[in-house]
Amino acid sequence: MAKKSMIERNLRRIKLCDQYKEKREKLKSIINNKNLSIVERFTAQNKLIKKLPRNSSKTKIRNRCALTGRPRGVYRKFGLCRIVLRDLCSFGQIPGVTKSSW
C-alpha cells in the first residue's frame, strides 16, 4: 500500500492539471505557431514556465492503482495494479475476464 501522502500528492496534481489545461494549451499553441514573431513566442514560453505551477503539467501525473495506490505495474484499461487485478480476476470480480488456456 502506498503512503497516503503520495496518493494525495498525485490527486492534487490531477486537479492542477485540469485547472490549468486551457491556459497551457493556449500558450503551447502560441509557442508552436511559426507565423508569429520570435518575441511573441518567447514571451509565451516564459509565461508557460514562470506563471504556471510546475505540477500542472500532465507529465507529472503518475498512474496509480485505484485500490492500493501502487505506482508500478498498473493496467490502464482497469486502473488496477497487476497484483490486485490477478486477485479480482481469480475470484471472478471483473466481468468478461477469463483465465486463458491454449
Swiss-Prot record:
Binds 16S rRNA, required for the assembly of 30S particles and may also be responsible for determining the conformation of the 16S rRNA at the A site. This is Small ribosomal subunit protein uS14. GO terms for biological process: translation. InterPro entries: Ribosomal_uS14 (IPR001209), Ribosomal_uS14_bac/plastid (IPR023036), Ribosomal_uS14_CS (IPR018271). Belongs to the universal ribosomal protein uS14 family. NCBIfam families: PRK08881.1. Gene3D superfamilies: 1.10.287.1480. SUPFAM superfamilies: Glucocorticoid receptor-like (DNA-binding domain) (SSF57716). One of its GO terms (cellular component) is cytoplasm. Part of the 30S ribosomal subunit. Contacts proteins S3 and S10. It comes from Wolbachia pipientis wMel. GO terms for molecular function: rRNA binding; structural constituent of ribosome. Pfam families: Ribosomal_S14. The gene is rpsN. Keywords: Ribonucleoprotein, Ribosomal protein, RNA-binding, rRNA-binding.
